[in-house]
Amino acid sequence: MSNTQAERSIIGMIDMFHKYTGRDGKIEKPSLLTMMKENFPNFLSACDKKGIHYLATVFEKKDKNEDKKIDFSEFLSLLGDIAADYHKQSHGAAPCSGGSQ
């Protein structure tokens, strides 16, 4: 039986996390910035147009345990923020409209 679209989406997020992690299974700041630029260029562009420099603060905001790395739960929190922004857009909000950003 093949995976559903939802299952493929989750597997894709896990694969994205693994692509940018180090040997310890966590993402360091340079890799997180690369991941954001490669995978969310439209989101970042919309934020930049509003004068919101998302990349300047995202690492510090998401590194909840302050270990200077992003673990999987912190990564999911980041994706949740981006998904929430796209959800707001589906209801007419402007891109990068705030909230948990």
Swiss-Prot record:
First-listed, main subcellular location of the protein, grouped into a coarse class: cytoplasm
Entries under Gene3D superfamilies matching the protein: EF-hand (1.10.238.10)
Domain EF-hand: start-end pairs: 13-48, 50-85
Tissue specificity: Overexpressed in psoriasis.
The keyword Cytoplasm is annotated on this UniProt entry: yes
Pfam families: S_100 (PF01023)
Chain segments annotated as transmembrane: none
Domain of life of the organism encoding this protein: Eukaryota
Binding site for Zn(2+) 2: 28, 38, 66
One of the GO BP terms on file: endothelial cell migration
One GO cellular component term noted in the UniProt record for this chain: cytosol
Binding locations of Zn(2+) 1: 18, 87, 91
Record CDD domains: S-100
Residues involved in Ca(2+) binding: 63, 65, 67, 69, 74
Record keywords: Calcium, Cytoplasm, Metal-binding, Repeat, Zinc
Molecular function GO labels: calcium ion binding; calcium-dependent protein binding; identical protein binding; transition metal ion binding
Entries under InterPro entries matching the protein: EF-hand-dom_pair, EF_Hand_1_Ca_BS, EF_hand_dom, S-100_dom, S100/CaBP7/8-like_CS, S100_Ca-bd_sub
Compartment(s): Cytoplasm
Keyword Zinc attached: yes
Entry function: May be involved in epidermal differentiation and inflammation and might therefore be important for the pathogenesis of psoriasis and other diseases.
Family indicated by similarity: Belongs to the S-100 family.
Protein name: Protein S100-A7A
